[in-house]
């Protein structure tokens, strides 16, 4: 097997390198120790190299840059057996000099052996040709010019222009070059000097023509210059005129006004105005409101004398007024505003040329037309106020009723000086051909009493308006006729009456009283509105007004019935600012126990939709009829327990700052949203309140004093069974957060009623509510004692029997006539002013027993209370804070100050065991914020005391 030779014997890398060397200059070393340089052209299968332009490298030609023709060979082939090695140069190796910006002669000639060499001085002469240009010719004697090489160096490094031309001439190539270069930069001029002079004269005439200049400015207008209100084009023209003062044409251009600049100094955008249509040749020109000049016939008005140039200031002011009128009329109706068309046409007209002089008789005849135009212009300037045209013509309506001068600017109208001639409105129609026409229009117009005051002014065209329309017509026009359209100008009626609404408001708004001027508007409740004067009809109940304060929240509901013989004073509404402002208000269908002639008939309570009313404040709301602010109400349904079956009205529930603890069952406190509990509790406005009133003594009866000693024995007998019944009703489990469950333990003997318990309820301990035991009198701030054996006697047998007899389950609690004893109690103790509890304060459970009148409460009179100290009353607010901290209570009623209430508290405190109650005098921490409590052992129980509340206060007060 033979070994492969040639290219197949080469590996891939060598083959790739050989392929890359094709076309490059390579150097080959042969076996005879010679070196050849040339371009590699091809490689054969036997690995033979074919080269072109081959040069043998010797020591003599090694450093030569160029090869001579004699040294080069076109093609040579080198066999593989003759090649020792081959290589090609990828990058030329250049001589590296020192890299420096500053190079000295030694660095340039570093390799030159200059040592020992003498330098020779060179002196150039004129014969060398140095210092001149290449085109310089040498003048030879005899006047002949001979081209010579200006740069005639011995080394022959360049050619002169003449040498090149001479060489071309030897080759029969003649150059057409001319030194003036006319055939390369200019064209041949056609025409003579006379033709050029005539063209310049025509150009000056065109430039002097105002129409041509106007069109040129319209085409070449600069939008940026129009936006600039400071730069004027005439400034540029004046600057150009200063440079060319010798030209009379430019001086005349300075005297003329620039048509692109308005008389008020602001540039005019003619492009937008010209695009609306070329109206310069349409219609006839008007002599009035000449803004940018008159027609060609009126150009003679402008003279060049000094007097008229000085009078241009006044003419400029007139142009400014015309500009303002034109601007006012642009946005208005252009269909029947003939003056606006004339103004717009004149705006596009060019300025007159002062240089153009009349050349024929037509220009002379136009002078008279100019004078007539000037007179018409003065007339139009006098009637400049008629330019205020409106877009639409008003309809024919009834004339306004002349009204007196009320003194207000609206009724007086504009000053008479602003009302121009012909713009004042006439109250009477102008004389017409048909005298009945004006009367017919008056009859067609509405003549109601309400619309007469607000009827717009009738538009009447008078003689001045007709004269104005005649003036708006062009003076030079003979075909145009007077405008007969109904378009009129705006006129202000000085005699127009004051504006009044056509329809009166459906619900008149009550005026705010002086003392409540900072309070929101209030409306009386329907129950407070008094009916017609006269005695009440039989069967109508008398509802004593309700004291709207939170102090009597836990009291039982009471109701008074007015006898037939009693008279009632009519009237209702806002409480007056005196001691007894509110009288009895009759209201039909009020739930509750009633005694009287109409008690046998069941009262029907009509279910009405709940209405939100802002009621006036009462005496319980604070002094000076102030409302409480910061209270937010939400509608909460609450059912009144004392109505007939299935006739339960829905009312709105009320919430107060704190949960006042009474002897009635209290519902769970309502957690109010966003109520500022930490803020000082002052006089705020109440919102969404139900009507709150209180009852005052009947007419002709004296006021009962607050403290009058112990009640009579007969009254005590009536009060004791009622108290037991009331205590039994309150013994149900409390839902207040301060309440605590019953704790078993030893306790004292409780008094037992001889009758059966009502509604099957057991007699519960009266100490279920822990916060009740801590309540004391707001006058003294100390506990009121009672004798240890102060147990009320049992009620009379008649009353016990009355309590045991229950009505049917579905019958109303007040069916039938009241017992004789109740009638006798009401007649004897009619002076005991009782308080009615509102429906929102009644406990939500419906009992089936008779609600006995509790004649143990005193009238809700505003007593002057003593200042309340810190931690005096453990009243808890809705958010768990102490409501008595900073809460002004002077002037508020407190049901705990009544003597009978103190006796009930004393009895409960004696019966309640110490293990099942809060510590005496606020020492307990259950359900009360401990921040306002005082630490310390509880004080010993006070000795039993007897007597009136005032005697107990003196006995308990420290010496």
Swiss-Prot record:
Report the gene knockout effect: Sterile, however growth rate, size and fat accumulation are not altered in response to a restricted diet in contrast to wild-type animals under the same conditions. RNAi-mediated knockdown results in embryonic lethality as a result of cell division defects at the one-cell stage. Cell division defects include polar body extrusion failure, abnormal spindle positioning, chromosome missegregation and cytokinesis failure.
Matches recorded under SMART domains: LsmAD
Annotated Pro residues bias:
789-798
**Domain Sm: from-to ranges:** 13-92
Q: Where is this region: Disordered?
A: 203-378, 392-484, 501-528, 697-831, 867-959
Q: List keywords of the entry alphabetically.
A: Cell cycle, Cell division, Cytoplasm, Nucleus, RNA-binding
One Pfam family hit: SM-ATX
Sequence ranges of Low complexity compositional bias:
246-260, 282-313, 504-528, 697-707, 715-725, 766-788, 822-831, 867-876, 902-911, 923-935
Presence of the UniProt keyword Glycosyltransferase in the record? no
Q: Can you list the disulfide-bonded cysteine pairs?
A: none
Which residues lie in Polar residues bias regions? 341-356, 473-484, 726-742, 756-765, 912-922, 948-959
- Superkingdom of this protein's organism: Eukaryota
Q: Which GO terms describe its biological process?
A: astral microtubule organization; chromosome segregation; detection of temperature stimulus; establishment of mitotic spindle localization; female gonad development; maintenance of centrosome location; negative regulation of centrosome duplication; negative regulation of gene expression
Its signal peptide is: none
Q: Which GO terms describe its molecular function?
A: mRNA binding
Where in the cell does this protein reside?
A: Cytoplasm; Nucleus
Entry GO CC: cytoplasm; cytoplasmic stress granule; nucleus
Q: In which tissues is it expressed?
A: Expressed in the central nervous system, dorsal and ventral nerve cord, intestinal lining and body-wall muscle. Expressed in the gonad.
Query: Basic and acidic residues composition bias: which ranges?
Result: 226-235, 270-281
Q: What is known of its domains?
A: The C-terminal part is necessary for interaction with szy-20.
Q: Which family does it belong to?
A: Belongs to the ataxin-2 family.
Q: What binding partners and quaternary form does the record give?
A: Interacts (via C-terminus) with szy-20 (via C-terminus); the interaction is RNA independent. Interacts with pab-1. Interacts with gdi-1.
Protein task: Probable RNA-binding protein that negatively regulates the translation of targets. Functions with RNA-binding protein szy-20 to ensure embryonic cell division, and to this end, plays a role in the regulation of centrosome assembly, position and size, and in astral microtubule outgrowth and nucleation. Required for gonad development, germ cell proliferation and for the production of oocytes. Regulates whole body growth and fat accumulation in response to food availability, and this may be through the mTOR pathway, upstream of daf-15 and rheb-1.
Per its record, how is this protein called by name?
Ataxin-2 homolog
Which species is this record about?
Caenorhabditis elegans
